[in-house]
């Protein structure tokens, strides 16, 4: 019995070893197969790349190299440097259009025609200069000529007008009653042509008879009050 048990234990131990060896061999076989497949795949990919390089040789990118141009060295900026601040863009502010205010036109009020007052011409007064006694003494004249001049007393020359005074026509002024906000001035009429001609004749011929005057030269109008 003991011998049978020992024989069975030995057989189990051998079987376990064989099973372990078989499992390890299977693992090694699978790993080998994977390696072989990987190598085949790499070989196949390399062969395809070589085939494409042979078919399209002109399409390979070539580096652009200029014989007379040296590479420009660029300084590496540290990453902590902040970017440069750009000036803010200022948009134009729309300004309100200034409208020109039209100036108010001054209202022109029509006034009645007023006859100009004619004045009589006067002859300028001739004032002869009388030499003083001191001036006579300063002159180099003989004494017999100076004595009669010194004894003479200067007499005033009467001032006379060449034309007699003529009456001046006074322009009638309107009389307005003190009524608030209701004042109507009377219309002034123009002087007739006959009165202007008569005034011209009086100026040209002062000897013309002036008095008596039966009618006034210009009609006098009474003011109208409301």
From Swiss-Prot:
The modification Phosphothreonine is found at residue 18. It is found in: Secreted. One of its GO terms (cellular component) is extracellular space. Form 1-P is phosphorylated once; half of the molecules are phosphorylated on Ser-24, half on Ser-25. GO terms for biological process: calcium ion transport; lactation. Residues 1-15 form the signal peptide. GO terms for molecular function: calcium ion binding; cysteine-type endopeptidase inhibitor activity; enzyme inhibitor activity. Pfam families: Casein. Mammary gland specific. Secreted in milk. Transmembrane segments: none annotated. The keyword Cell wall biogenesis/degradation does not apply. Its main location: secreted. It comes from the Eukaryota. Keywords: Milk protein, Phosphoprotein, Secreted, Signal. The modification Phosphoserine is found at residues 21, 23-25. Important role in determination of the surface properties of the casein micelles. Belongs to the beta-casein family. This is Beta-casein. The lineage of its organism: Eukaryota, Metazoa, Chordata, Craniata, Vertebrata.
